[in-house]
């Protein structure tokens, strides 16, 4: 894959993720957009690691750590959302102010 194509793909994914985080009112959609942002960061890490320093795999190793963090977020996030849904009967972000109660 050409260097510029990978950066453009990463920029598109990151932009879609940021737009989704800003405009979403649903917690599940916000979690999906956060995953898009993390995947865009991984593409950047692997691309720059391959292009600038192909002998040392620092970017690839760091992207594995980001994938592990994303997996933990993917496991814990829906559990938190389902807990909030059980208590509030809604997954809308503006209705889930837990500090009010």
From Swiss-Prot:
GO molecular function, one term: oxidoreductase activity, acting on NAD(P)H, quinone or similar compound as acceptor
EC annotation from Swiss-Prot or TrEMBL: 7.1.1.-
UniProt record, GO biological process: ATP synthesis coupled electron transport; photosynthesis, light reaction
Catalysed reactions, as listed in the record: a plastoquinone + NADH + (n+1) H(+)(in) = a plastoquinol + NAD(+) + n H(+)(out); a plastoquinone + NADPH + (n+1) H(+)(in) = a plastoquinol + NADP(+) + n H(+)(out)
Listed InterPro entries: NADH_UbQ_OxRdtase_chain4L/K (IPR001133), NUOK/Mnh_C1-like (IPR039428)
Bilayer topology term: Multi-pass membrane protein
Keyword annotations from UniProtKB, A to Z: Chloroplast, Membrane, NAD, NADP, Plastid, Plastoquinone, Quinone, Thylakoid, Translocase, Transmembrane, Transmembrane helix, Transport
TM stretches of this protein: 2-22, 32-52, 61-81
A family per Pfam: Oxidored_q2
GO annotation, cellular component aspect: chloroplast thylakoid membrane; NADH dehydrogenase complex
Subcellular location as annotated: Plastid, Chloroplast thylakoid membrane
NCBIfam families: PRK05715.1-2, PRK05715.1-4
Family assignment from sequence similarity: Belongs to the complex I subunit 4L family.
Subunit and interaction comment: NDH is composed of at least 16 different subunits, 5 of which are encoded in the nucleus.
Database matches in PANTHER family: NADH-UBIQUINONE OXIDOREDUCTASE CHAIN 4L (PTHR11434:SF16), NADH-UBIQUINONE OXIDOREDUCTASE SUBUNIT ND4L (PTHR11434)
Function as written in the Swiss-Prot or TrEMBL entry: NDH shuttles electrons from NAD(P)H:plastoquinone, via FMN and iron-sulfur (Fe-S) centers, to quinones in the photosynthetic chain and possibly in a chloroplast respiratory chain. The immediate electron acceptor for the enzyme in this species is believed to be plastoquinone. Couples the redox reaction to proton translocation, and thus conserves the redox energy in a proton gradient.
Protein name: NAD(P)H-quinone oxidoreductase subunit 4L, chloroplastic
Organism field: Glycine max (Soybean)
Gene responsible for this protein: ndhE
